[in-house]
C-alpha cells in the first residue's frame, strides 16, 4: 500500500493515530483514483455495501468546528474514500432548526450525539469532484430510528415520476474516531439539474421558495444557482397569477406554471409517507407569517415550468409521530376562514392550514386527478409487500453498520423499530384507501 503524506494538515487518512509532537504523519491511504472523481453517480448510490469515509483535520480545528457548528462554515480536511485519497476538501456541519439549532443548549455545548455533515470537494481545489459531484450530504438520521426513511421515500417519489435526489448510506470516521452510520444524500445543485433536466439544465434552482409574494428579495434569499444578476420575473408572475385568480381559474393559472399531473403524483407520495414536515406544513412565526420548507423549485429556462423536488425526508413513514403531530386539516380542505392556524407538537408550534395557501387551493380544484395518482401509487410502488421487501433488503445491508454505530441505537431497539415500520406500512395504505373512499380528514 502506498502512503499519503499531508504536511499542510499535519495528518492524513486512515485508522492510525496521529503522531506526537505535531509532526507530519504518514497514514495508509492510496493515491487518488481518477475513476472515483469521474465515476457514474448511479454506481455510488447503488453500491451493495456501506462505504467508509475518513476525514483528517487538526485536533484544534475539529474542536472549533464542533463548538461553532451552527456557523456552517467549511474547514480544511483531508478525505479518504475506501482507502483512497480524495484530496483536500471542505467539511462542515449542516442542518435546520430542528436538526442543528435545537441541538445546542448553550453556545459551546453539543448535546446531540451526532450531527449531519456536508463535504464540498472543490472548496480548496478548483474542479475537484467525487463521482462528478461538487458536494455530498451526510445526514445523521437522528429522527429516524430505522435509518431507512430517506432511501425508501426518495425512491418512492422517483418511482412515481417525481424528480428526487439519490440516497444510500456511509460510515464516517474523523481523526480515526468512528462517527457512525449516515445517510449519504445527493446534493440538489447545478450537477443535479444537469442530470435530471438534460434538455433544460441551466435554469434557476430555489430552496424553500414558494409562490407567495411579489417581493424580489424573498427569491434573492432562496436562489441556489445562477444567482448573479438573477431576475425572478417568472416566479413573481407565478405568484401573482395564483393570487389574482379563484376556483377553476386558479387551477388554470397553476397549469400555466407547473405540470399539474406531476404535482398530483408528488402529493400522492407526500400523503402516503406521512410527510408532516414538508410542503404542506406552514409554520407560523411570531410576526404571523407562515412558511413551509424541505423542498426545492426548479425553473426550466426554456419552458418556464416550475418543477418541485422533495428534500429532507427523515420525518416520514412514522405512524406514531404523525399522530403526535396534531390535528390539521388536509391540503384538500379550505377552511371557512383563512388564515386558520392550528397548534401542533402539543402546543409547541403553530401551523397554518395548507388549504389557505394559493397553490394548494388551486390543486384541490382537481381532486379526481389526485385520486388517480393515489390509485396508481397504491396499485404500483406502494402496493402490499413491495415496500416491506425493500425494508428487509435495506435493513440487511445496514444491519452491521447500525450495530457498530457508537451513538446507537442498540441492535435490539433498531430491530424492533424496523418491525414497527413494516407493520405501519399497512396502516398507511389503509389510510390512503380511506381517503380515496371519501374521508376528508384523518379521523
Please give the residue ranges for each predicted region.
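Phosphate/dinucleotide-binding and metal-coordinating scaffold of catalytic cores
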Residues: 14-16, 21-443
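Bacterial N-terminal signal peptides
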Residues: 1-8
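C-terminal motif of bacterial Sec signal peptides marking the signal peptidase cleavage site
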Residues: 10-12
Amino acid at each position: 500500500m502506498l502512503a499519503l503524506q499531508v504536511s499542510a494538515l499535519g495528518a492524513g487518512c486512515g485508522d492510525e493515530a496521529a503522531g506526537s509532537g505535531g509532526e507530519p504523519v504518514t497514514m495508509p491511504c492510496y493515491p487518488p483514483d481518477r475513476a472515483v472523481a469521474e465515476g457514474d453517480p448511479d454506481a455510488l448510490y447503488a453500491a451493495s455495501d456501506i462505504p467508509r469515509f475518513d476525514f483528517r483535520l487538526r485536533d484544534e480545528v475539529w474542536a472549533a468546528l464542533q463548538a461553532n457548528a451552527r456557523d456552517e462554515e467549511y474547514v480544511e480536511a483531508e478525505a479518504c474514500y475506501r482507502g483512497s485519497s480524495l484530496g483536500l476538501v471542505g467539511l462542515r456541519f449542516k442542518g435546520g432548526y430542528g436538526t442543528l439549532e435545537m441541538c445546542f443548549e448553550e453556545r459551546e455545548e453539543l448535546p446531540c450525539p451526532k450531527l449531519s455533515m456536508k463535504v464540498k470537494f472543490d472548496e480548496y481545489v478548483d474542479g475537484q469532484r467525487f463521482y462528478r459531484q461538487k458536494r455530498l450530504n451526510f445526514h445523521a438520521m437522528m429522527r429516524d430510528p430505522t435509518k431507512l426513511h430517506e432511501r425508501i421515500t426518495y425512491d418512492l417519489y422517483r418511482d412515481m415520476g417525481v424528480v428526487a435526489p439519490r440516497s444510500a448510506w456511509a460510515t464516517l470516521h474523523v481523526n480515526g474516531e468512528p462517527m457512525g452510520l449516515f445517510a449519504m444524500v445527493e446534493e440538489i445543485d447545478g450537477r443535479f439539474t444537469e442530470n435530471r433536466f438534460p434538455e433544460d439544465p441551466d435554469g434557476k434552482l430555489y430552496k424553500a421558495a414558494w409562490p407567495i409574494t411579489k417581493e424580489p428579495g424573498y427569491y434573492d434569499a432562496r436562489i441556489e444557482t445562477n444567482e448573479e444578476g438573477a431576475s425572478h420575473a417568472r416566479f413573481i408572475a407565478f405568484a401573482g397569477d395564483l393570487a389574482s385568480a379563484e376556483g377553476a381559474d386558479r387551477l388554470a393559472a397553476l397549469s400555466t406554471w407547473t405540470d399539474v399531473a406531476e404535482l398530483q403524483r408528488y402529493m400522492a407520495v407526500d400523503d402516503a409517507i406521512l410527510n408532516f414536515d414538508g410542503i404542506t406544513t406552514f409554520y407560523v412565526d411570531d410576526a404571523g407569517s407562515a412558511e413551509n420548507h424541505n423542498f426545492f423549485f426548479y425553473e426550466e429556462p426554456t419552458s418556464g415550468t416550475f418543477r418541485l423536488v422533495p428534500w429532507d425526508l427523515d420525518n416520514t413513514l412514522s405512524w406514531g409521530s404523525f399522530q403526535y403531530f396534531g390535528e390539521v386539516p388536509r391540503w384538500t380542505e379550505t377552511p371557512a376562514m383563512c388564515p386558520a392556524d392550528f397548534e401542533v407538537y402539543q402546543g409547541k408550534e403553530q401551523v397554518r392550514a395548507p388549504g389557505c395557501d394559493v397553490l394548494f387551493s388551486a390543486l384541490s380544484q382537481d381532486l379526481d386527478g389526485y385520486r388517480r395518482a393515489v390509485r396508481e401509487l397504491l396499485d404500483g410502488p406502494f402496493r402490499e409487500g413491495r415496500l416491506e421487501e425493500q425494508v428487509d433488503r435495506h435493513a440487511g445491508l445496514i444491519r452491521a453498520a447500525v450495530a457498530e454505530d457508537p451513538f446507537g441505537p442498540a441492535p435490539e431497539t433498531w430491530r424492533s423499530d424496523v418491525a414497527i415500520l413494516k407493520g405501519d406500512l399497512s396502516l398507511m395504505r389503509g389510510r390512503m384507501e380511506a381517503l380515496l373512499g371519501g374521508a376528508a380528514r384523518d379521523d
